[in-house]
Amino acid sequence: MMIKMSISRLLFCSSLFLSGISVFAQELPYKQPNLPIEERVNDLLSRMTLEEKVTQIRHIHSWNIFNGQTLDTEKLKAFSKGMSWGFVEGFPLTGANCRKNMQLVQKFMVENTRLGIPVFTVAESLHGSVHEGSVIYPQNVALGSTFSPELAYRKAAMITKDLHAQGMHQVLAPCIDVVRDLRWGRVEESFGEDPILCGLFGIAEVKGYMDNGISPMLKHYGPHGNPLSGLNLASVECGLRDLHEVYLKPFEMVIRNTSVLAVMSTYNSWNRIPNSASHYLLTEVLRNQFGFKGYVYSDWGAIEMLKTLHYTAHNSEEAAMQAFT
């Protein structure tokens, strides 16, 4: 009887303790969905260490945490070091395995990190989700030749069905580069050579994604479609008039006509100044002139290339600082 009574008291006290933890967690402003977003964000930022803030603007690559088609929880635990990361992709995953694995990563981040911040799941989708089993659509250069932005809207809206089924929040599209050199190896990713056409198609695709619950990302910000000798990583050489009336015009159009919140900067350069470390492009033009309020996401390897390709940084730390331009 005494043992039963002790167990009953223990369970009762434990329930009070756990409910107290639950109430405390719910009282944290950043976890209360009924509060204004800005208030929740400010509260969360006030609780974060510098390292946690830095980790929020970093990306987990699939090779960091997956073994083939399976999430390696031990790898994820060692890699994350108790902190939630900003973004994760699973490009090698098939469509059938994608959602399950993304949910496992999300569950880990929410339950096994200090602040429980969810991660943003990211997919590539220039003309259909990159994951095996997804519907593939015509490349942008073919879509642009129809001169029908409505088709771009419908295409993006259809792609979101696959993205939702795969557990994705964000797509690395649309590509609105203006092509002016057919030797460039990425011509098919563009809607064409006309900046207004690229802008109109970009607006349509962004709305197609956003109207259906997926966050799009404009790319590639900075002159990109006319590199020297047609080489992908080479500098684009042009004056201010061509910069603004040709290469940046589609970005200005989309930013002014939609509520897009993500832009990807290129890994090449404009007049030999790296686009991903250009104060003029990223701050003076993108934010101050175009009024962009979202975040800039560097293209694959762009920050490291400040050290290995552009030679503007002596090491990775200096390269990262240059990106905060």
Question: Predicted regions: what is each one?
Answer:
Residues A25-T325:
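Glycoside hydrolase catalytic-domain context in secreted enzymes
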Residues M1-E27:
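Bacterial Sec-dependent N-terminal signal peptides
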